Design a protein with these regions (language model features):
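C-terminal binding/interaction regions
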Residues: 2-38, 86-146
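Short beta-strand scaffold segments in enzyme catalytic cores
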Residues: 42-52
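Hydrophobic "anchor" residues
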Residues: 56-57
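Active-site- and interface-proximal helix/loop "cap" or "latch" segments in soluble metabolic
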Residues: 70-72, 80-88
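Short amphipathic alpha-helical face segments that pack within enzyme cores
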Residues: 72, 76, 107-110
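Feature captures the catalytic cores and cofactor-binding loops of soluble hydro-lyases/lyases
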Residues: 76, 80-81, 104
Length: 146
């Protein structure tokens, strides 16, 4: 640590970032519950946690149908956030049934960009939990069409 305490501040910031990603991962894992709810609908094979700008965390699971009416876990979590009166996304994590992370699909990225047209580039997405790799939505969606 130098006389300005920069190393300490950086270490504290890193720990805080690790803590929030751990919390998001744990919340997603808690709702991850793959199951069949009918002959043609499976749910819970992917779970997502979205941290709103307020710090509140919203979760959702995927709903896979025999038609196009299903929904991804990330959009389900975002809709949960919006239902609860929030619209500013800070961080997103999506967990597959094996505990590994997934990147949001094109439809989920598109919704994030449309919900936060002026700030979508700042949204952070963890793409590898074990290696702690985080990318911004700008990195994942560099050429948004609007």
């Amino acid at each position: 640590m130098n006389k300005y305490g920069l190393v300490k501040v950086d270490t504290e910031r890193r720990k805080s970032m690790q803590d929030i990603w751990d919390k998001l991962y744990e919340k997603a894992m808690k709702v991850l519950n793959p199951r069949k709810i009918s002959d043609i609908v499976e749910v819970g094979g992917v779970a997502s946690a979205v941290e709103a700008e307020s710090g509140n965390i919203y979760v959702g699971v995927c709903i896979d149908c025999a038609c196009t009416l299903g929904i991804c876990a990330e959009r389900n979590a975002m809709f949960n956030m919006i239902t609860n009166g929030e619209s500013k996304i800070k961080r997103v994590i999506a967990v597959n049934c094996d505990g590994k992370l997934l990147t949001p699909c094109g439809a989920c990225r598109e919704l994030m960009t449309q919900v936060m047209t002026s700030d979508y580039k700042k949204i952070e997405v963890m793409i590898d939990y074990e290696k702690r790799i985080v990318k911004t939505l700008e990195e994942l969606t560099p050429f948004w069409w609007i």
